[in-house]
Structures are given as C-alpha cells and as structure tokens.
Amino acid sequence: MRSLTLSLVACSIAMAPLAAQQDRATFAVLPFQNEQSFGLPPETYVALESGLAQLLASELARSPAGQLADRGKTGEALGKRTVPPTRLDAASAQRIGALVGARYVVLGNFVDAYGKIRVNARIVDASSGRFLKAVSNDDPKLQSRDQLHRAVQSLARQILAELSLAAPTESPALPTPAVIAFSQGLAAEEAGDRAAAAKHFQAALDAAPGFADAKEAAARVR
C-alpha cells in the first residue's frame, strides 16, 4: 500500500509541471516590420526586425503565465506564408498560430527617425483571427533609441496586462548596442553565416555580459 501511495505521489509531482505548462498562454511573436527608418545603416534595421521580435518574445516568456511557441516551427510557418512580410494581417497570423499551436500571435513594427523610436505591437487571438489590442511605447521617455529595450519591455507588460496575465519578472534593460549586435547575429545566423553570427553574439555579450538570449545564441552557433 505504501508503495502504491508513493507511486501516486511521484506521478502527481511529475504531472504538475506539465499541467502548469498546459495552463500557460502560448505566444508566437512574428518578425517586426521596419517602417522606413533612418539614422542607421539599412541592414541594421533589417536585423532589428528579428531582434526586436526575439526580445519581445523573451519578455513575454518571463511571465509565469506565458510561454513561447517553438522557434523552429514558427520559422517554418513563416516560410509557408502566402503573403509578403509587409502584408501580414490577422488572417495570416491566425494561420501561423494554428500551425505552431499558439494561443496569441503578436505582430509588430517600428520606425526610427534619426534616434526617435516608435515601437508598436498588435495582439491577435489565434483561434478567431481577431485583433485584440494595439500597444505602443507612448511614454516619451521610452521614445529614444537609447531606450529601445525598455520600450520593448513596456510592450510586453502592456500585452500581458491586456490579456490579464501575470507581469513578467523584472530584468535589467539592455543597452542598445547589445540589442543591435544581437539582432545582427540573428540576421547572420538566418543567412547561414555562423562565424559572423558568433562574432555579433559575442559583441552583444561584451556590451551586456548577462544577456541570456545572446548566451544561448552564441552556444547555438558554436
């Protein structure tokens, strides 16, 4: 009897994390769109499209009530889209959400006017294809390029609050040079240049030694 009781307890303990995981809202964050930014080299803005999406995804995953759709599956789903990236809409987001098992899909865009940044995100309910809310870095203190990561953190907090999900755990804001280097690393990795990617990820870590996403990415391209 004691053996059966211990087995049931062990089973309950093993199942608890799985149940908690199933209760968490799954997000898919699609690459941001650059809306005619100026002030940095064009290739930097192209890189930021993936970089900002990854940083927002990481912030959403800091919520005890949030988790991310598989990054590889999301990339595959994007490759299957039938519209160009500049025309991603709610219907496209709904299809991608269904493919990757996401409850919510986030579409974003940004514009940099010589250092003044605007970052926007829209939440799509993947089950209905309905836009739920648009959020932005409305606080003037978060509209400088120097505050880019803080602006992304603000978007995550607004998204989670709109969905009545727990706020993300606190994390220090990253310096913008680290954000740019990380984004450039992602772009190089996506292009298949692992050596260049490793160099950029290391630059991101040099600028922000505690940058968890950069550490993970650097290990991935070794």
Over which residues does each language-model region extend?
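Short beta-strand->alpha-helix linker/helix-N-cap micro-motif
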Residues: 22-90, 105-112, 132
